[in-house]
Amino acid sequence: MTAPSASRLSLGIVALGAYTPERIVRNEDFEARMDTNAAWIESRTGIRERRFAAEHEYTSDMGVRAVQDMLRRDPQALTDVDAIICATVSPDALMPSTAALIGMQVGLVGAAAFDLSTACSGFVYGLSVASGLIHAGTARRVLVVGAEVLSKIVDQDDRGTAILFGDGAGAAVVGPVPEGYGFQDFVLGADGNGGSSLYMRSVAKQLPGGFAMGDFTGMNGREVFKFAVRVLGDSGTQALEKSGLTTADVDWVIPHQANVRIIEAAMERFGLPMSKTIINLDRYGNTSSATVPLVLREGLDDGRIRDGQQLLLIAFGGGLSWVAGTMKWWGGAPSLQPDRAAEHSAGVQG
């Protein structure tokens, strides 16, 4: 990749697409195979239903469909893109990278491509990394994809995890935006001491303490909840302070969609009403790295997110990891316009 020095460019999201699979799995569907009921699931998590990928639909497939949704809105969205980041913990394979497979299918052969694994923090991490590549003069524009097929790596008979997760994908292009718009600051971090609280056993056997080998995601829900409430508030506050902002300046908090109780606790920490955040986990569950772009796309399509608004992005995930970012939303690109008839809520078809 080659690009001119861009250290003073204002950078932000210049294109955005989303995809969710067609299959809807409701809380009631879990009642027949585990000790639970639909009302209990919703009261504990805020989730009513989620989407599951088809049998032969994988992360790269969904990432491609999110990019296709972007191109449907703006056929020129991939112009000058010379790097691809795919944030995922459910890659098609350990190698080749899912990012490379997506690039092959959307006409970006030759672009740098790599996967990023910070679980639910991944998409916002990816925005920060993409900005760094551009500011370093290494890339001109960067495609950031957050995509997951969590239904395939979660034990569907385990009440502690099966009820939480869904599948989906979002895709954004990071590039130059007009001065005064775009990303302001990011705060990123991780603490491996909490690695045993949220993990994928088959790739976690070398972590301190060790884990039994297996095929499914494991989670200590109580510990993750306490961690999330703390780091979302801390990192969000730090990002605002770095940007010279306060919570009074924030139009929308865009949180990772893990659990409505976590979001409520974070908003209380910020001293902001729930009307200042956007929630869609009731319909999609926790899609890990896809949650933030899915929320952004929904907020654009229904007209809540508008040009010039101040956003605070917050997420946490495996690692344990956390990230927060501030940005002044730029709505000037074709794919960033409202689309109330958007197909992604019912599954964009590639």
Curated annotation (Swiss-Prot):
A single Gene Ontology CC annotation of this entry is: cytoplasm
Per the record, the pathway is:
Lipid metabolism; fatty acid biosynthesis
What are the recorded GO MF terms, alphabetically? 3-oxoacyl-[acyl-carrier-protein] synthase activity; beta-ketoacyl-acyl-carrier-protein synthase III activity
Key words, A-Z: Acyltransferase, Cytoplasm, Fatty acid biosynthesis, Fatty acid metabolism, Lipid biosynthesis, Lipid metabolism, Multifunctional enzyme, Transferase
Domain remark in the UniProt entry? The last Arg residue of the ACP-binding site is essential for the weak association between ACP/AcpP and FabH.
Major localisation? cytoplasm
Work out whether the entry's keyword set contains Lipid biosynthesis. Answer: yes
Task: Please name the Pfam families in this protein's record.
Answer: ACP_syn_III, ACP_syn_III_C
What EC number(s) does the entry state?
2.3.1.180
Matches recorded under SUPFAM superfamilies: Thiolase-like
Q: List the lineage, top down.
A: Bacteria, Thermotogati, Deinococcota, Deinococci, Deinococcales
Q: What species was this sequence derived from?
A: Deinococcus deserti (strain DSM 17065 / CIP 109153 / LMG 22923 / VCD115)
UniProt protein name: Beta-ketoacyl-[acyl-carrier-protein] synthase III
